Swiss-Prot record:
The lineage of its organism: Bacteria, Pseudomonadati, Pseudomonadota, Gammaproteobacteria, Enterobacterales. InterPro entries: DHPP/DHXA_dioxygenase, Xdiol_dOase_suB. Belongs to the LigB/MhpB extradiol dioxygenase family. It is an enzyme of class 1 (oxidoreductase). It catalyses: 3-(2,3-dihydroxyphenyl)propanoate + O2 = (2Z,4E)-2-hydroxy-6-oxonona-2,4-dienedioate + H(+); (2E)-3-(2,3-dihydroxyphenyl)prop-2-enoate + O2 = (2Z,4E,7E)-2-hydroxy-6-oxonona-2,4,7-trienedioate + H(+). Keywords: Aromatic hydrocarbons catabolism, Dioxygenase, Iron, Oxidoreductase. This is 2,3-dihydroxyphenylpropionate/2,3-dihydroxicinnamic acid 1,2-dioxygenase. It comes from Escherichia coli (strain K12).
Length: 314
């Protein structure tokens, strides 16, 4: 069967701190084109690789990877909220297959996800509940982090499993590219924030969540005025990364350490490993070709914003 892939940056700042209208129109046009290609492909199953931002995963237990056998989106920053339509038996079978391949994949029957999962489902499929989905969390902010090699191997294992299903499979990668928004770090946290990072942040009071979101919005507004206030975006790195993906050279990223990536492009750039997993997964279906490449640094969203598709040729 055929597979399709789309990788897309996300940002909680969409609708809160937007770029100029012509830039917004350009991005919306790119997303609309991707949505049309996906609709024409008519996926029967979605595999969504996405990170979390201390909304569902915390330091009480922080796996490098987790497959949601059941998952609910919390609706942060106005994103879609509700249950994801996870096919339970298929998710369980996927977990067993990945474990048998040598990848230690955690599972959750009550996974809580945020805008990192919700935005691609909203933007590209029209909602959370349009197509059965296997949601796969890849830790992109909480050290210690998985590396490129292990993430690639995860994607390959999931790709091999889904290639046996006789279904049209859509792989989505959500996140990146270069960026470093204000995300708390356990080593630097005060007592209150440490408690939140250790797990109490899963059920934040509405007032505290609003303050947290406002801090991110304020940081974006300052970044637009002075891009020295946060780690700068890195368009050169972002475009080199996208070229590696298009050329099927993702294995070369194995040599890039987590420390190097943080220094080059920002501490939240590790979200690009969702793209690596997606491209590794589609490779299990045979030959593919990329299409629809788009990139633009968007300070208002604190992101090097990228969009890239691929389709199998067999």
């Amino acid at each position: 069967m055929h597979a399709y892939l789309h990788c897309l940056s996300h940002s909680p700042l969409v609708g809160y701190v937007d770029p100029a209208q012509e830039v917004l129109d350009e991005v919306n046009g790119v997303i609309a084109s991707a949505r049309e290609r996906i609709a024409a492909f008519s996926p029967e199953l979605v595999v969504l690789f996405a990170p979390d931002h201390y909304n569902g995963f915390f330091y009480d237990v922080m796996p490098p990877f987790c497959l949601g056998v059941g998952a609910t989106a919390i609706g942060d920053f106005g994103s879609a909220a509700g249950e994801l339509p996870v096919p339970v038996e298929l998710a369980e079978a996927c977990a067993h297959a990945v474990m048998k391949s040598g990848i230690d994949l955690a599972v959750s029957y009550c996974m809580q996800v945020d805008h990192g999962f919700a935005q691609p489902l909203e933007f590209l499929l029209g909602g959370l509940d349009k197509v059965p989905v296997l949601p796969v969390f890849i830790n992109g902010v909480a050290t210690p982090l998985p590396g490129f090699q292990r993430t690639r191997m995860l994607g390959e294992a999931i790709g091999r499993f889904t290639s046996t299903l006789n279904k049209r499979v859509l792989f989505l990668g959500s996140g990146g590219l270069s960026h470093q928004p204000p995300v708390p770090e356990l080593a630097k946290a005060d007592a209150h924030m440490r408690d939140r990072l250790l797990g109490s942040g899963k059920d934040l009071p509405a007032s505290e969540r609003e303050l947290r979101q406002q801090r991110v919005i304020s940081a974006a507004e300052k970044f637009v005025e002075d891009q020295r206030t946060l780690h700068p975006l890195n368009p050169i790195w972002d475009n080199q990364f996208m070229t590696l993906l298009e050329q099927g050279r993702i294995q070369e990223l194995d040599a890039v350490s987590n420390e190097e990536l943080s220094a080059i492009a920002g501490k939240s750039t590790h979200e690009i490993k969702t793209w690596v997993a997606a491209f590794a997964a589609i490779s299990a279906f045979g030959n593919w070709r990329s299409e629809g490449r788009y990139y633009r640094p968007i300070p208002e969203w604190i992101a090097g914003f990228g969009s890239l598709s691929a389709r199998t040729e067999n």
